[in-house]
Amino acid sequence: MSDQSELKNMGLKATFPRLKILDIFRKSDLRHLSAEDVYRALIAENVEIGLATVYRVLTQFEQAGILTRSQFDTGKAVFELNDGDHHDHLICTNCGTVFEFSDPDIEKRQYKVAKDNGFVLESHAMVLYGICGNCQKGR
């Protein structure tokens, strides 16, 4: 499906800023991008889209389900393409790199903990903080 069709299916017009920002996410080597990351990528491509427009489009994409937002301890929101698969995150407290992982045993345990405490789990997000392998090598 083309980006134009995807946006239209989500109820959004396929404007130049929306198409360009979606393209940035699709071709980025990084999976998690802040508004500032997107803005810098646009500048690097000599595309004139203001930071306020970037924030507005990211919010629209989040509301439409195209992107998901995470707020890690870094204090700034980061966005990633919503592929529909649940995953958790490991964050390096030294360099800020975000690693994704999925573990079925952890998922089962979380549902059990919720059930054992009288909860029906609707949603969850697990974020683990530590030092990544690359940063450990530099110590």
From Swiss-Prot:
One of its GO terms (biological process) is negative regulation of siderophore biosynthetic process. InterPro entries: FUR (IPR002481), Fur_C (IPR043135), WH-like_DNA-bd_sf (IPR036388), WH_DNA-bd_sf (IPR036390). Fe cation binds at residues 86, 88, 107, 124. One of its GO terms (cellular component) is cytosol. Keywords: Cytoplasm, DNA-binding, Iron, Metal-binding, Repressor, Transcription, Transcription regulation, Zinc. Residues 84-139 are annotated as: Dimerization. Zn(2+) binds at residues 32, 80, 89, 92, 95, 100. Residues 1-83 are annotated as: DNA-binding. Signal peptide: none annotated. NCBIfam families: PRK09462.1. Belongs to the Fur family. Acts as a global negative controlling element, employing Fe(2+) as a cofactor to bind the operator of the repressed genes. This is Ferric uptake regulation protein.
